Amino acid sequence: MSLQYFRELFHYLRFSYNKRGLYLTLKLFYLKFDNIFFDLRYGIDSSQNVSLDKLNFQITNKTEGVEYGTIAPYFIQKILELVKFDTSDIFVDLGCGKGRVLLIASKFNFKKVIGIEFSPELYLIAQNNIGNCLSNNHFITEKINIIQKDVLEYVFNHHETVFYLYNPFSNKILIMICDQIKGSLIINPRRIIIIYVNPRFPEILIDKGFKQIMKYDLINKKCFVFSNQVQN
C-alpha cells in the first residue's frame, strides 16, 4: 500500500465523518480495513482501484468500460449469503478485474466460478491472486476459471445461471449483454440471477424483462438482484 493511498483514505474518512457522522464513518472504516486486510491475509493484490487509462491495451469497447473498482469482502459475502443458490449454479463475474469476487464465490456451493476480463494486465493479476491461494483451504480454487476476453466476444455456454456485475460497463454494453443472456434462455430455458452492484442502469434489466427480487444497501454501496423468475 502506498503512502498516497493512506492519504486518500484519511481524507475520504474525514469527508465521511462530516457527511455521515461518527457511527456510519466507523462502519465505513471497518469496510475499508476489511478491504485492505483481505489482501494482507491472503497475500494478494486486489484492493486498489485501477482506471482504464492506466491499462496498456487496445480493445474496441475499451471506452465503454469503467475503472476496476474494489468492494469490501464483507459486502460480497453478505450478498451471496442472502441470495438462494443451487449446487448446479454456475457463477460468472462479467468484468472480474483482479479476481477478488471469484475467490469469495468459490467458497459457496457453485458448480463452477468463471471470470471474464478484457484487460491482459488485470487478467494476469487475477491469475496470480488465484495462484497465491492454491494452498489455502479457505477457497476452492479448482472451481475457478478466468478467461481473458472482451465480454461481447464471450460465447455463453447456455448453462451459466448467476451473473455478477460491479458496474463494469456503459449502458450500451449492458444492453448487449442482456440480449446475449436472453438469447441463451431461448436455447436453454432456466432460472437466471443477475447481481448488479453499484447499479447505474437498473432500468435496462427491467426493460429486458428481468424482475428485481432483492435490494441490499451498505452505507456507500448498493446492490440490486434481478431474476427472470420470481423466487418463492
Over which residues does each language-model region extend?
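Conserved SAM/SAH-binding beta-strand->alpha-helix loop
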Residues: 119
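C-terminal substrate-binding/active-site "lid" region of AdoMet-derived donor-dependent transferases
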Residues: 172-230
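Active-site segment flanking the S-adenosylmethionine/decSAM binding pocket
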Residues: 146-186
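Conserved class I S-adenosyl-L-methionine
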Residues: 89-97
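Glycine-rich SAM-binding Motif I of class I
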Residues: 99-103
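S-adenosyl-L-methionine
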Residues: 1-86, 123-158
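Short beta-strand element of Class I
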Residues: 111-116
